[in-house]
């Protein structure tokens, strides 16, 4: 089912650009929404895990790549999506989780992670060795990055061969700023300089050849660049096609390649469609999906507070605030300002750092309490309009809480599918 990925460049050259949404989340409600949408049209869905989220040592989700595949497959089975329509991708695979260690140790762990991803059945592999490790500059030179990426590619190639699996498709390069959105207000973001993009492509082609990996380079389908889209804590930098025109033109000299756009969260449908048209057809989205989940969850928290006398006054939001204050590691350093500003960012930031807390026992218990409070109850249309007015009434009226949450995420996915043409390919 990777044909859709392999045909992206040809579709652009033929003047019929098509795209694909890259769902970058391990949240079960987000995954269910994406899989349910794919099942409705029986089309492929691309689901990606990041190096910090899922790795051979467990990552912050506690899942190895094989665990993640099994987890997603179980949801797909429940939703009636054949396993062959699932495309698994690994994002930013490299030394990042261990960058505070010496390069040799970090890269050894990165290699083990890549091996685990490939043998688990991940077909789309983004290799990112751009970050410095202990004693190195924060940003490495291009030659070092390319050599490290080539070494990780060799690991992936060997893993696929030994497991009897198809060879992976590769994504190379990285974007600036770091993955997951900026941690400050951005007014504009400059697209990658066209010559820098050309140099990155040419250098990787040359160094892969030096490593005897020219065949693998033929399976590089995209390079990650910055087309000028980003989101900060409370603002979004919209895509400007004119500003990215010269960067898009680089692809005219690389007929087998497209660009991959990260941090497309919160872009409008016209902006996403323009990205696909201009050569950035792989649209990665993550925080924007869990943001929609949190919006709907907090709306239900308000509704339960209004409807159920024994529920209390927004106990879910209060639990999350207490939890984030007691374990600030996942937001501190990313949010800035006075106490009120920090509180607002903890809950409502576009960066959505709250997403790291939903799997903690206290959060799971609070969400379960909310579900139990509303299960079997009919929410009046007037309350739905008051707190969930952004969602079509037909999508939420008479629905259980879980279905409301799925509908909220699906509304975001619908914007992406309208822009990419998914479901119509």
Curated annotation (Swiss-Prot):
Coiled coil: none annotated. GO terms for biological process: carbohydrate metabolic process; phosphoenolpyruvate-dependent sugar phosphotransferase system. Pathway: Carbohydrate metabolism. Keywords: Carbohydrate metabolism, Isomerase. It catalyses: keto-D-tagatose 6-phosphate = keto-D-fructose 6-phosphate. Its EC number is 5.1.3.40. It is an enzyme of class 5 (isomerase). One of its GO terms (cellular component) is plasma membrane. Induction: Up-regulated by growth on D-altritol or galactitol. Transmembrane segments: none annotated. It comes from the Bacteria. Disruption phenotype: Deletion of the gene leads to slow-growth phenotypes for both D-galactitol and D-altritol. GO terms for molecular function: isomerase activity. Belongs to the GatZ/KbaZ family. Involved in galactitol and D-altritol catabolism. Catalyzes the epimerization of D-tagatose 6-phosphate to D-fructose 6-phosphate. NCBIfam families: agaZ_gatZ (TIGR02810). This is D-tagatose 6-phosphate 4-epimerase. The lineage of its organism: Bacteria, Pseudomonadati, Pseudomonadota, Alphaproteobacteria, Hyphomicrobiales.
């Amino acid at each position: 089912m990777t044909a859709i990925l392999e045909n992206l460049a040809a579709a652009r050259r033929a003047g019929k650009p098509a795209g694909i949404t890259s769902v970058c989340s391990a949240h079960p409600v987000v995954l269910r929404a994406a899989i349910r949408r794919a099942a409705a049209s029986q089309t492929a869905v691309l689901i990606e895990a990041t190096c910090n989220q899922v790795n051979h040592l467990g990552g912050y989700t506690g899942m190895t790549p094989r665990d993640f595949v099994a987890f997603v497959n179980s949801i797909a089975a429940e939703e009636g999506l054949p396993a062959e329509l699932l495309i698994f991708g690994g994002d930013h695979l490299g030394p990042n989780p261990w960058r505070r260690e010496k390069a040799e140790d970090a890269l050894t762990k990165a290699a083990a992670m890549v091996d685990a991803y490939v043998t688990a059945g991940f077909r789309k592999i983004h290799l990112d060795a751009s970050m410095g490790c202990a004693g190195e500059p924060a940003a490495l030179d291009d030659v070092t990055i390319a050599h490290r990426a080539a070494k990780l590619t060799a690991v992936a190639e060997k893993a696929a061969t030994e497991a009897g699996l198809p060879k992976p498709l590769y994504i190379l390069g990285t974007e600036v700023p770091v993955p997951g959105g900026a941690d400050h207000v951005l007014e504009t973001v400059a697209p990658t300089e066209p010559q820098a993009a050309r140099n990155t492509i040419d250098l990787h082609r040359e160094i892969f050849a030096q490593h005897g990996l020219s065949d693998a380079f033929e399976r590089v389908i995209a390079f990650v660049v910055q087309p000028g889209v980003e989101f900060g804590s409370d603002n979004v930098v919209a895509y400007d096609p004119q500003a990215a025109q010269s960067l898009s033109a680089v692809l005219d000299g690389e007929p087998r390649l497209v660009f991959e756009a990260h941090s497309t969260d919160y872009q409008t449908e016209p902006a996403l469609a323009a990205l696909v048209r201009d050569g950035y057809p792989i649209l990665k989205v993550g925080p924007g999906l869990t943001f929609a989940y949190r919006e709907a969850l907090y709306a239900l928290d308000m509704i339960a507070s209004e409807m159920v006398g024994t529920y209390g006054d927004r106990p879910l939001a209060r639990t999350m605030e207490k939890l984030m204050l007691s374990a600030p590691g996942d937001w501190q350093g990313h949010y800035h300002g006075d106490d009120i500003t920090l509180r607002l960012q903890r809950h409502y930031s576009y960066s959505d750092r709250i997403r790291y807390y939903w799997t903690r026992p206290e959060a799971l218990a609070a969400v379960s309490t909310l579900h139990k409070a509303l299960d079997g109850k009919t929410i009046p249309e007037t309350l739905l309009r008051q707190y969930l007015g952004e969602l079509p009434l037909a999508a939420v009226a008479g629905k259980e809480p879980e279905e409301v949450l799925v509908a909220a995420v699906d509304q975001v996915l619908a914007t992406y599918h309208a822009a990419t043409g998914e479901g119509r390919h």
